[in-house]
Amino acid sequence: MTKSNNDFEDIARWRMDFCREFGVTINDEEYFIDKVQTYGYREIIYQYLDHFIEGNSEKVRPNTTFEEIYAFYQLDQRLKNEALIDLQLFEQTFKAALIDVIELYVAQLKAKKFNFYQESRLKLEDLLKEKYVMQTGRVIRRGELRSRIRRIKENYLEPFDGYNYLYSNEITTWVLIKEMSFGVACNFFFLLHHKQQAIILKRVFKNDLSLADFEKVIESMRYFRNRAAHNYSLLIIKNSDDEFLYNTVYKSLLRLKNQEPARRMKSNFKDIINNYLEEYPKEKNYLPSLDQLKLSNLLKDDAYENGCIDWNARG
């Protein structure tokens, strides 16, 4: 049995009553109903009401309006979207290095393994280790990666018109890595041999980075992206090191040789936060991004020959 519009209106009234019990002022009931039905009552209230609770009280700060809570929700959305773009720039840099190193490695392996007249196809075992055990205990296996590669090969998109004709319907390393999710590309990296891993890390990061440190960087980025993908709050969430997630992302981006993502994050976060504070100046005393999050510091700071590899070969 489907709910009628009257049922949903009743639910909206109950929700307004609940918010008012916490001391939230609702000046425009239609605005409240529109926003909670459009974006989700729990998305806005459950995730962001705590920010406005006063001390150990069960009430929000005096004169807190629903409009303020919704604006705080929107602030997190804007910061989240900006951070995701900056992480995407990092992903592009990482994948570019991964592609170049793999193509060179494939060419070197082919030169050693085959003579000029042999069909020069490599197996996945020629390129990757059987498994890699991360510090968290998670095991990355070559066999699992092979199944991902097979699905990509069966379903990849043409990057430009005529690609399949040019490459005789063979997937190149470029398209293979391009089609991988960030997580799968990282798994591919961890299964590479140490020499190739070291070359990639040196190309991507400013200072020497150990594999263990890289694991931490990647895991923090994955956690951030997973929370963002499911629209969980990020402004008031800390990682296992008691650090707010936006700050973790920014610190990771500062380690890159390509400083465009960090510069962009700093500049755009500054604009987003300042625009928010212009409308809600009293939030300067409460906003985590200017206090515990320590983004106030942020506001102050100023190819190779294509290798041919049989990605579906057994081994």
Task: Locate predicted features.
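Extended intrinsically disordered or low-complexity regions, especially N/C-terminal cytosolic tails and loops
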Residues: 1-223, 235-315
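Acidic/aromatic/glycine-rich contiguous surface patches that form carbohydrate-binding/processing clefts
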Residues: 231
